[in-house]
Amino acid sequence: MRAAGLPVHVRYSGAGDDRKPLALFVHGHFGSSRTWSGLTALLSGQLECVAMDLPGFGRTPPPACYSTTAMGDTVAAVAEAISDEPVHVIGNSYGGTIALWLAATHPELVRSLTLISPAVSLSPAGLTMRKCLTVLYRLCAGGAGLRRQLSGKDARALTDAVLKECCMDSSGIDATVFDVAVADVREALRNPARITAESRSFRALAATLMRFHFPGGSSLRRVARRITVPTAIIWGEGDATVPVRHARRLARLIPGARLAVVRGTGHLPQLEAPQRVAAIIAAHIAHIAEHPARV
């Protein structure tokens, strides 16, 4: 489909029943629409699921601008293209930050919001400031710098290392889901434009997250307070990328937000405990359908 002047690749599951609520899934870094395949398979009986490739990721070509605003505008255009009614929006990590921005700036397009460990902090648990700055430098060094760092890396070994870093126990991830993650990483390693997308989008995210701590209308803190749609926040108890303390902080900022902390999981609970995450999402959306006047 075309959205915001760009051809955007989307994947449907659970389609064919107009009575089903429609949900739009937004992935994070080193991901694509395929990232959601395990979760959408569990939800496709209750929802019509649409997972998109963000600009520069998967099969969607690179955009002119990687700012959070520009990415959010593309997601908004996709939401308008897939439905005449507001849709349920679900995002993880970087995709969660974009989904948060979308709900605050385009509430007319969003029926509900589900944030799964959204990226709302620049200070991962256990990292010293020096290490934080080193990580930021490497990720923001530009596509060429990131390509040099990843040159010669094996996709399966790199995926395994990343998942071990992000998850409390990556050994429990379904083998098919792991293979999908490997395919995404392999695609990124082979495609210079994809590495550029990873680097430039992370640089834009870093700028957005820095504004979380500053006053002004563009601060992420103020953006969160503007959200009026029903919101569920799902967070891994052992998230070392964005510690769970930020979940409670974010839940206090978003009016009426409901927080579910998933035990035994890290930054990717939808991969680590898909059944539990699917149940939380399904219950959240069902509650909205059953009590439309109360949400």
Residue ranges with predicted function:
Residues L150-V223:
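Conserved alpha/beta-hydrolase catalytic His-Asp/Glu region
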Residues L6, R11-P61:
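Conserved HGGG/HGGXW glycine-rich cap/lid loop of the alpha/beta-hydrolase fold
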